[in-house]
Amino acid sequence: MSDITGTAFPQVAPGGVPDWSAMKAEDLLAYREAENRRRSSPQARAITGEPDPGATIEWQEVALPDRDLPVRVYRPVGADRADLPLVLHVHGGGFVGTAVQCDWVNSHLAAQLPALVVSVEHRLLAPDTPLSAAAADGWDALQHMLQHAAQWGIDPARTAVFGESCGALISALSAIRARDAGLHLRAQVLVNPAVDVTETMFDHASITQHADTPTLAVPQLRLFHRLAVPPGADARALSPLYADDLNGLAPALVVLPTDDPVADHGRRYAERLQAAGTPVRLAEYPETGHAFLSMPGLVPQAKAAGAEILEFLREALTA
């Protein structure tokens, strides 16, 4: 999903917003390029927040067997250590988005935990890259980091995953795969998670209650769904909400803005985690919308949520 605001677009619906239902592939690519330039601009910092000066930020590439995967790396200033905890982050924005939009929270976590925070610049949804490709990016990055822990200066025994929106879906899937592979994660943080991409995605009550919010609307979700699960894709396998077994997963913090179309996705997932015996904390932030964590300049509650995430990870990664 995406926190889309204020970018001109060639096809607009009444009210001046993008006409998601009429969007063609070439239109989406043009919009994506323009929107990600805006999110990466210095001017956007007034909304997305200033990075913590206690962390360095740089782009690197993870060399996977079949592709090079860009990642944005946040490291504590002066941390010449080989045993930092790892927080693997996956940004939101199903078909629009960039790790840069999360510099504020990720740099703060890196500086204050301290930890190495790595944000995966996953393949955004498009006709040729469905959700399964982005999910593979998240999982492959996690495996690579743990297999090359010395190269990255991390302690693989102190690892957490952290995702926002569709990035939370990717992080939740990675947590499930990690358990199945015998990898022990310390924590998972899921912020406004969209964890159902089956046909029931639109049946949750919050979809109707918050169908047209400034940062996410149902027409966007329908476009997301069309790109995420093309004909022949296994939507259930990509939906953590319907995973067969949620027992034995890393303890979870689920952060929910209440005024969000997918708020009930997070509520139902927290209920399923609890029923399965996985420790879970559900933190709801009243009168906040989708993607609020990436907008501390506009939404004061973002800083409170960031502080809660910091304390949750600090407890998990230092125990």
Predicted regions and their residues:
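Hydrolase active-site cap/lid region
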Residues: 176-232
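Short amphipathic alpha-helix adjacent to the substrate-entry channel of hydrolases
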Residues: 100-119
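Catalytic nucleophile-loop/oxyanion-hole region of alpha/beta-hydrolase
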Residues: 99, 118-158, 296-302
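Short beta-strand/loop motif that positions the catalytic acidic residue
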Residues: 254-256
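Gly/Ala-rich beta-loop-alpha elbow adjacent to hydrolase catalytic centers
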Residues: 163, 167, 171
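Catalytic active-site module of serine/aspartate enzymes centered on a nucleophile-bearing elbow/loop
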Residues: 299-319
